[in-house]
């Protein structure tokens, strides 16, 4: 068993984004490019919880990790993760003593 990399041909950047987003899953995406502009556009347009550019590493302890769509619930890791375990309550007291 090992990692698999599907290789698909495409004619335009828009086609890549459309094909990548056309599914019910959204855990993470991987982008290989030499263009910072392409990397930024892909990161903005891909419907995933995280995007790795030119690396296979997408999760680190300091960053939130989790998917969107049918890939998981909420975020793990980072400061955002604690919000899933909190129940915020507001209490206003008009006590005169």
Stretches with model-predicted labels:
Residues 1-97:
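Conserved C-terminal structural/oligomerization subdomain of aldehyde/semialdehyde dehydrogenase
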């Amino acid at each position: 068993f090992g990692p698999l990399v599907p290789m698909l041909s495409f004619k335009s950047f828009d086609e890549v984004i459309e094909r990548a987003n056309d599914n019910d899953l959204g855990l993470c995406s991987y982008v290989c490019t030499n263009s910072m502009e392409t990397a930024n556009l892909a990161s903005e347009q891909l419907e995933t919880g995280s995007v790795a550019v030119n690396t296979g590493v997408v999760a680190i302890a300091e960053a939130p990790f989790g998917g969107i769509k049918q890939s998981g619930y909420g975020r793990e890791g980072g400061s955002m993760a604690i919000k899933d375990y909190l129940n915020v309550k507001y209490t206003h007291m008009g006590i005169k003593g």
